[in-house]
Amino acid sequence: MKAVRLHAFGGPEVLRYEDVPLPRLGPGEVLVRVLAAGVNPPDWYLRDGYTAVPGFNPPVTLPVIVGSDVSGIVAAVADDVRGFTVGDAVFGMIRFPSFGDSAAYAEYVAAPASDLARKPGGLDFVQAAGAPMAGLTAWQYLIALGHDAPNPFQTVPHRPVPLEGRSILINGAAGGVGHLAVQLAKWRGARVTAVASGRHQAFLREIGADDIIDYTATAPETMARDLDLVLDTVGGPSTGRFLRTLKRGGALFPVFLGFQDAQEARERGITVSMAQVRSNGAQLAELGRLLDVGAVCVAIDSTFPLAEAARAHERAASGHLRGKIVLTVG
């Protein structure tokens, strides 16, 4: 089969489209014929050797296939698998945050059955491939964590906060995690302030944002006040600026590493919490039901053939995405 692998770390040019062996099916696994694969930040973190994630240096054996998000058709199931049969349309985030010999940027993937859910009938394969990591990140930050694995970012488990009737600001609201978080927060009854470039204003209104701050015109931390929650999908060292927008007792949820203002957060009475998103087929099935009835939608920024994964990574690096980048397979 064809797959995209790394033989060395570096820029998009190190992504190699090449022949690799078909993955072997292990106990508890499903062989999926991949029709689309989502592109996510951990894909380019892996590609460049995690230089963008200081202090994070997991062991990686090269060559390695890239990617975690897939949608496709079940081609085979292990003898001990129940709930999936050959021909089922499925989607999922595979083995995240761990690694394996089989991954998403490929024509076939051997996936743990517990990582998969049936693809909603109202969703095409491209949209389905764009949903898993972004959707599960938003879900596990805002709705329910869904696992008891140790949190690598803090000593206590992440705990979502009630959303109904609360005011929430989402930074990076037009991006992959952000646009799904806007919709999930609205579904749970929150009032949502969306922060994004002004070019995304109509899109953000369409998906339910109550208020919009164009960060290219106004610093959002000077506009918003007395919020209950900030979900910062951009994160990094600048995420502390949102502390001043929160009321005492509020919460700041950075999605990416780099928060440096723990002392100020304590003085202001603000809870700061992060989560490590993990594969979860059951949660994905719940999200799938919302996608199927149109309560939540997946926006697609752009698509590229699997053979042009390098171009997809170049598009990601250019920034200002609206929704998800997806690779098409076959």
Set out the residue ranges of the language-model regions.
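C-terminal hydrophobic helical "lid"/dimerization subdomain
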Residues: 1, 284-330
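Glycine-rich phosphate-binding loop and adjacent beta-alpha segment
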Residues: 233-297, 329-330
